[in-house]
Amino acid sequence: MVNFGLNSASILGIFLAVAGAGLYFLRSVRPEVSRDYDIFFSAVGLLCGLILLFQGWRLDPILQFGQLLLSGSTVFFAAETIRLRGITTEQARRSAPYADDRRVSKTRVYTEAELDQLEPEDEPVARNNRRLRGYDDDARSGRPDGYGEAEARPRPRSQGRNAPPTNPNPRPTRSRPSAGRSAPQRPGPAPGYNDNYGYEDDYSGWESGANDVWDDPTPSRRPPTRRPRPEAGNDPAPSRRPRPSNNPPNDSFGDRPERNAPRNARPYEDEPPAAYVDYQPIDEADLTPRPTTPEDPADRNQEQSRSGNPRSQRPSRSPVDGEEPPIGADDQERFDY
């Protein structure tokens, strides 16, 4: 049964219902001081006000007085909380570097998402390294840093051609035995290499005062392959070496005449000269095209005798004393009957 009467409890109920509705609409009037949990307290105030409005006549005067004190205290703390919110918002606006004066719609509620500021992940740095992976592994394995700097560093140019370049890595060489007389030195393979493309070093022959032959400014080249020289017994004619000229060659890089000497200074006399062949003129009849008719046996024999081995037509030469006759040569005396 609903008994609506105008008493103190009913008046208190109307006040609580109006306060709850006002707390709800505070979000639209002053959104800077409103909070999300105000909706809950506005619903509680509206419900309590309706109960007192319709059922307040059942309460005793002492109970109505208790409801009045409780409602007054609640309204006081609600007003004080809203005032403190306004003060805090004003201080935050003054201390902020910029003022947010955006217009807020009365029909829609705008809430900004509060996102945590995350630190960016460390991305691997892309290294533009042109060296191979094997070189990087060698560098990490403990190889000294200055190992490859001598090769990568460009060689500075000398001011003049007479100034020999400096060698960053000097190496000792083998000492050369001194001969009784100065013999001409023919160009040969660089020391440290043999004709079999093998590398051999005589560590016992290194001396501190030996001349350094590795400081030649010209790039080192592999010596060309030389044919084995015939032995003294099998050599038909002794080979003669060219005599060195009295004027020493112009060597601007050091006193080493064998460095600038040409490689082919000694004539190639390893093989015996070819045998002399008499000059035989060519007939014009041989140059004319021959008919394709079948040949006669007589013409064939004549052609074979004409185009025979020129060695058989040349005069025989008596061998010199101590010289063997050439192999494969026909002995004319065997055919003379």
UniProtKB/Swiss-Prot annotation:
Bias (Polar residues) ranges: 304-316
InterPro entries for the chain: Uncharacterised_Ycf66 (IPR010004)
Region listing for Disordered, in residue ranges: 111-337
Sequence ranges of Acidic residues compositional bias: 113-123
Ranges of biased composition (kind: Basic and acidic residues): 133-143, 253-269
Family: Belongs to the ycf66 family.
Protein name per Swiss-Prot or TrEMBL: Ycf66-like protein
Species, as recorded: Synechocystis sp. (strain ATCC 27184 / PCC 6803 / Kazusa)
